[in-house]
Amino acid sequence: MTLSSKLLLLLTLLLSMIPAASFAGSVTKDGYYNGIKLCGKVKVVKSFADIKVQVVKSFPDLKVKKVNAFPDQIGEWQFVDSFPDFTIQFVDSFPDIKIQYVNSFPGVSN
């Protein structure tokens, strides 16, 4: 294998990893993760969740406000035991998204 073919192979491998790294774990600007709108009724489960969530104090992907009714805006979550819009699992490492609880101005972080 020549040096130029090795470089071409290395470059191809590096470029193929860029799209996967840039989209992994990202919340879109309009508040979706993997097609799930990040507002609504949420159920916490111990396994097989739609989204793995880590609670952080700084640099969140999403700012979440707990509400008791009408979780209509992105970042407004109503925690329920039945009929959820999506499920989450709290994790300490390797989350799909990171959230921070807030009392006002929920939504996607800039």
Please annotate each region the language model reported.
Residues L9-A20:
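Bacterial N-terminal signal peptides
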Residues G25-N110:
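Repetitive, compositionally biased segments used for assembly/scaffolding
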Residues M1-L9:
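Bacterial N-terminal signal peptides that target proteins for export
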Residues S5, A21-S22:
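Generic extreme N-terminus detector
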